């Protein structure tokens, strides 16, 4: 019952943010960068671009991956990393839009809890501290089996943004 209430809080917050961020999600990207290899190899290729520090090219690669393989088990992870390409460059509106899309489209992905956390953090970075804190504070209730490392990050972010 309590988890359902917390998820309702998150959903209401997301609905209000969704209106503001919707136009950011549909940014057209025309470039294709992924090689014609297996899906797993394409994901690995995109991750290697990310690790190399070419975040603009990684943005294109992860977007292409998600657009092409939206039903694949790695799509949720790719969506998270797509958001990270923006966050690293401090493009917080684009990052928030990507994390929001990841949370909504891939709620059962292994990256879903981190998507929710980073959505909260980016909202707080954008000055929407109250909304961001709702995401951060409710993370454990929304995803009770979250990794300890993500809960630790959540704790840190609660303190950083003075969340109650």
Spans of model-derived segments:
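Acidic, proline-/serine-/threonine-rich low-complexity intrinsically disordered segments
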Residues: 1-45, 49-50
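Short solvent-exposed coil/turn linkers within tandem alpha-helical repeat scaffolds
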Residues: 68-74, 105-111, 141-152
